[in-house]
Amino acid sequence: MYLINVLSLIIPILLAVAFLTLLERKILGYMQLRKGPNIVGPYGLLQPIADAIKLFIKEPLRPATSSKLMFTLAPTLALTLALSLWIPIPMPYPLVNLNLGVLFILAMSSLAVYSILWSGWASNSKYALIGALRAVAQTISYEVTLAIILLSIMMTNGSFTLSTLTTTQEHMWLIFPLWPLAMMWFISTLAETNRAPFDLTEGESELVSGFNVEYAAGPFALFFLAEYANIIMMNALTAILFFGAMHNPMFPELHTLNLITKTLILTMMFLWVRASYPRFRYDQLMHLLWKSFLPLTLALCMLHVSAPATFAGVPPHM
């Protein structure tokens, strides 16, 4: 694999993340009846560049009592994993066409828990540690439903390869037959990416800023990039799973445009949710998953496993 292939994937993602921060600030501004960033460049369009320069020229301070190696390693690991999640995403062709692309995404997103845990523990601050423990409990819990929902979709798809979902959804998007799963998937992705109303890890009122409270400058920017790269990746995955983009081999660009548009609409929904809803209480968050989502997803998964056999039909690609 050539370096240019990897760079042509990473650079657009980082640019998308930069402008997503601007989009978020603008949308939140207009929803709160104010302008948002509008000084740097025309309509504030150069604000992300100014933010990046400001963050990376500041001195990265490290608490005297922190664990030096882990403190530095955690943000690096977070961004590396966030970018590696994009490897099997078909846009329309993935960087590496993995046979078990879905399992790869699940494994990588599970590993991201370590970066949060290390950052909280290495900071040697009680606020950071409480934030990290909350984040880990939340991420691990919601990954259970994400995995079960993915399994149900793969049963319908008949293969663990993400590229085949385009063929499966040629005649009908999977959101129509699987709409209860799609609703739970969307809410679980909100929780998985620590977004409002599930941003308990960053509860400013009680935890100052969450697991990254001791981070400043460059390392903080890496966490920030990782979080937003994960948001875009989750939305791209949602678009692929439930809103399969039409793929014409003659015009692969159309597939990319289609996917980008759907991802953007879903990302706008993430921002809309953030502007509209208050934060959940921690026990409500856990009850929602273990008492509502888990039994429902398990029942629907059983249905999708048994339905093809019951009706003597076979899923496509079997």
From Swiss-Prot:
EC number: 7.1.1.2
Role according to the record: Core subunit of the mitochondrial membrane respiratory chain NADH dehydrogenase (Complex I) that is believed to belong to the minimal assembly required for catalysis. Complex I functions in the transfer of electrons from NADH to the respiratory chain. The immediate electron acceptor for the enzyme is believed to be ubiquinone.
Gene coding for it: MT-ND1
Protein's name in the database: NADH-ubiquinone oxidoreductase chain 1
Organism of provenance: Dasypus novemcinctus
One Gene Ontology cellular component annotation held by this UniProt entry: mitochondrial inner membrane
Gene Ontology terms describing biological process: mitochondrial electron transport, NADH to ubiquinone; mitochondrial respiratory chain complex I assembly
Entries under HAMAP family matching the protein: NDH1_NuoH
Single GO MF annotation: NADH dehydrogenase (ubiquinone) activity
Family: Belongs to the complex I subunit 1 family.
TM helices/strands, residue ranges: 3-23, 69-89, 100-120, 135-155, 171-191, 223-243, 253-273, 293-313
Subcellular location field: Mitochondrion inner membrane
